[in-house]
A protein has these predicted regions:
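Acidic, metal-coordinating catalytic cores used for nucleic-acid/nucleotide bond scission
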Residues: 202-209, 229-231
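An anionic, glycine-rich sequence signature occurring as long contiguous blocks
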Residues: 14, 139-164, 168, 172, ...
């Protein structure tokens, strides 16, 4: 995008960001925020601090200081962001999606960098991993998507090296937490800011943890998530405590294959999402089961959950899902939420391409969080503008679901400018 095109976006972006001014503490900081977000939206080969500063005509050191130590409250700004999303785009059937994203980085100085699994490359790599929470209205033709929270996953090796943490500006009380615990903290915080989700959904890295389910229950949050085939459940609660194998928990793949409650069912076709090629249909069976108690794995939970087996009739792919939804919730609704995970995958892809989400070159924890916030605000701007230019009203499609051929936040800036003109 040319310098003229960047300037043409500035009034609309400034208007959207105006409500964040109180958290900038100084007028100059608001100017830096605007310059940095505009730079993230620009068509630059690299979207790290130096090329953004050069394109904006700002001193490189100024933007470095803006991210690292200038006095503005990025945490309060993010709280405001969450409240604003609910005020302007809230809907009754909003879905929250948990996922982690890896960013390949060299060296040892970037906070949290380590050889670990990196989804970006599909292998163990030197990378930084973030844990994120996405909000989507799951609209079939123009979904509104934005990431409400981003936090650093701190590896154990970092957590145990407090000197290294101190050099990276990582707080003394910040320790290693598994991604599912970070996700729960993000959800609690968002709920505190008025965010409400019809369902939250996630992959098996979260779903395989019984304690994750019990904590979601404690929050009163309806959820559905994928689980691995060796996840254990109880088909029913034993009448009394028993150590007999026949009364124990079973792998979900074996239960779905051999238990009469599944064998006696016929496969039922369910539309899980709408695509440009028409409805995506999967065959499903479902039953009510008990999970293993997180504190005592040999004991079943008091409450029941849904166990759903879903089969793609075209490829034969099998997925297993657990849901804490009530017995009255339909399979269609549960699977609509379960198959909404694609929104965050596409958001990551577009955010890295369009808004420099993974282009950070920082050495402090605060700088990393601030970069992620600015990138998320850039994506929010695109999503809000796309929705406005297409004549949508927030929450108009609260009862709809499915996949889109185009999605908010996915529009490139040349298209945006053409629509704006």
């Amino acid at each position: 995008m040319t310098a003229d095109q960047i300037r043409s976006l500035q009034p609309e972006l400034a208007a959207l960001l105006e409500s964040f001014r109180p958290y900038m503490n100084r007028a100059s900081n608001f100017g830096h925020l605007l310059a940095y977000v505009l730079g993230l939206l620009a068509d630059l080969k690299r979207k790290s601090i130096e090329p953004i500063a050069l394109a904006a005509g700002t001193a490189v050191r100024t933007l470095q200081e803006f991210l690292s130590f200038l006095d503005w409250d990025h945490e309060a700004a993010n709280d405001h962001f969450q409240r604003q999303v609910m005020d302007r785009h809230g809907c009754e059937r909003a879905i929250g999606v948990f996922d982690a994203s890896g960013h390949v980085k060299q060296g040892r100085m970037t906070p949290g960098v380590q050889r670990q699994w990196c989804g970006e490359t599909g292998k163990t790599d030197n990378c930084v991993v973030g844990q994120h929470l996405l909000y989507t209205d799951n609209h079939p033709t123009n979904p509104f998507n934005c990431v409400l929270a981003s936090d650093l996953f701190l590896p154990k090796e970092w957590s145990e090296d407090r000197k290294r943490c101190s050099k990276a500006g990582i707080p003394d009380d910040m320790v290693h937490r598994p991604k599912w615990r970070i996700a729960l903290d993000q959800l609690r915080h968002a709920i505190g800011n008025g965010v409400r989700f019809w369902f939250v959904t996630f992959d098996e890295d979260y779903g395989k943890v019984p304690a994750f389910w019990s904590d979601l229950d404690a929050l009163g949050q309806q959820a559905i998530g994928e689980v691995p085939r060796n996840f254990h459940v109880f088909a029913k609660r034993p009448a009394c405590r028993s150590l007999q194998r026949a009364h124990g928990s079973k792998r979900v793949d074996n239960l779905c294959r051999f238990s009469p409650v599944f064998r006696n069912q016929k496969w039922r076709q369910v539309t899980v999402k709408e695509t440009t090629r028409g409805p995506a249909m999967w065959e499903v069976k479902a039953a009510r089961v008990h999970l293993t108690d997180g504190s005592t794995p040999s004991r079943p939970t008091e409450r029941q959950y849904w166990l759903i087996i879903a089969r793609n009739p075209e490829t034969g792919e099998i997925k297993y899902f657990i849901s804490n939804a009530s017995a009255s919730v339909s399979l269609e609704d549960m699977l609509t939420a379960a198959f909404a995970r694609w929104h965050i995958e596409m958001w990551f892809e577009r955010a890295k391409q369009e808004a420099g989400f993974g282009a950070f070159e920082v050495r402090t924890y605060r700088s990393l969080l601030r970069h992620w916030l600015c990138s998320r605000l850039a994506m929010y701007f695109l999503a809000a503008q796309t929705q406005r230019l297409r004549g949508e009203k927030p929450g108009d499609h609260a009862g709809t679901s499915g996949r889109s051929d185009q999605h908010a936040g996915d529009i490139n800036l040349e298209t945006h400018l053409a629509l704006a003109g």
